[in-house]
Amino acid sequence: MLRIIFDTNVYVSAFTSPNSKAEDAYLLAVRGKVELYTSVSILTELAKKLREKFQWDDSRVQTALKHISKVATVIKPNVKVTLLQDETDNRILECAKASHADLIVTGDRHLLTLKEFDGTGITRIAEYLYIFEDKNRSKI
């Protein structure tokens, strides 16, 4: 089963854009089709973005975070990454390394430029959905 890390932007799109590719990606994890991993740092950044950019109140933010925490394995990475200037991007890489993820799914150009980090592929949502479908098609 694919081990996946979602960047904060994927969660934001999944929760704010119904019927989007991001929601489709998240629903694969909800349905147990992939193993989703996240960290407290990623969830903290998500809460901040939902409050500041989308004016979500604390109750709505907490509901989203609780849902993610039920779907994903929340880890506390024991590694420190300082590869990129944006510290939030480094937190994504730390989570990927600590969880031995197969893929980071993101729309962030700084992460996408890397293409791969420590054995973990870095891809856009559409490519992730294609990879998932292709991987499962070959099992039939």
Residue locations for each model-derived region?
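A secondary-structure boundary/capping signal
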Residues: F6-T8, T38-S39, G107-D108, R124-I125
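Alpha-helix capping/helix-boundary segments
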Residues: V10-Y11, I42, H110-L111
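Acidic, PIN/NYN-like endoribonuclease modules and their adjacent C-terminal/linker elements
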Residues: R109-I140
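Active-site neighborhoods of divalent-metal-dependent phosphate/nucleic-acid chemistry enzymes
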Residues: V71-I104, R109
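Short, well-structured alpha-helical segments
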Residues: V61-S69
